[in-house]
Structure formats: structure tokens, C-alpha cells
Swiss-Prot record:
Keywords: Chaperone, Cytoplasm. It comes from the Bacteria. HAMAP family: TorD. GO terms for biological process: protein complex oligomerization; protein folding. Belongs to the TorD/DmsD family. TorD subfamily. Signal peptide: none annotated. GO terms for cellular component: cytoplasm. Its main location: cytoplasm. Involved in the biogenesis of TorA. Acts on TorA before the insertion of the molybdenum cofactor and, as a result, probably favors a conformation of the apoenzyme that is competent for acquiring the cofactor. This is Chaperone protein TorD. The gene is torD. It is found in: Cytoplasm. The keyword Cytoplasm applies.
Amino acid sequence: MQHSSVTSPRAAIYQWFSQLLFQELTEAQLVTLGGRESRAWIASLSTIPGLASDVKRFERSLTRVLHREAREQELAADFASLFLLAPPVGVSPYAGHYPHTTPAQERRQMNALLVEQALAPRENEASDHIAIQLALMAEQISREASVATQYYFLQHHILCWAPLFMASCQQREAEGFYVLAVAMIVHFMHEDAQYLESLLMDNVYCRNH
């Protein structure tokens, strides 16, 4: 990732996917998604290395969703069947349900991080939900947290389980709207981690020369 092409939209990307994965989309949100500005923004993500094919698949899925006769209700059903049903039928969007940690431990750590940023879980949602973790990442970027802080949070709180989350989603429905959204944000996070790592290496090099 090139610094100039990534720095400005990073927070917006995390925030956008946070909102997309937090709860069922309303008709008003679907109207916005189908608008010219939103479609252009989504298309612009294809310029990020590694995301072009993900973006194309997501755009096709979004077009199908927007043309459904009862799109709000049908997409809500998709969301519920994927994220609201207990595993193994559904897929847990909570970090604490994955092998690297426990619900109590992850939520305790997330709650502490949210307090540091003067934030609180949205609508009483458990703080280890993928959407809240993405929102916190967006907040760290917006507040210009150190590169090391961003990198640590991304690696130790999201990327340590998000690939497993993505794989479980893909096992349920390879081309579903939410499955493709999850794949896109996970692949973006891998690219973002490499970007942050390159900045850390640059910092080390500058200190040593």
C-alpha cells in the first residue's frame, strides 16, 4: 500500500464496514448504498492492492440485493441467518467465541480500550463484536493514535480471529452479500497490517540512521 493512497480513507473504510456489519440495514440505508456517491466510493476500493476481485464480487451482490422485491426484509433474513443464529448453524461475530481468547477476557480488554477513547458499546452490544472492533480501529486512526498502537490492536484484537470468522462465513454461503463484505474487510485489514508494518520499519530505520 502506498502512503498517499491509503492514509486518508483508512478510517472511513473501517467505519463503513462497521456500520454494514453492526445490524440489519434499513430501507433508507439501502437507498444510500444504491446511490451514485456510495457506488462510486465502493468502486474506488478496487484501487487498493488485493481488493479488486473482492470489490467486483461485492458490487454484483449489492446490485442483486438492491433489485430484490422485498430487499430490506430479505437482507435482514440473510443477516439473521448468518450472524444471529448460534453456531454451527450461524457464525459468531464475537471475538470472544474464537480460540485465541474467551468472551470475558476479550470484552474486558475491549471495554478498557473503549473507555480510553471515551467511547461505549453501541446499544448495549457486547464490546467484542466485529463491528465495534472495526469502529474502534476507525477511531484510533481518526485520533491519530501511534502506528504501533494501531498495529497492535489490528493484529491482537481483530486479525487474530477475523480470518476464521471469514472462513466460517464462506462455508455457509460463498457469494452472499454479508459474506462478501466480510471477505473484503478482512482482505483490506491484511493489506492495512502490511502498510502499518512498513511504517514501523521506516520508523526503526530513521532512528538508526
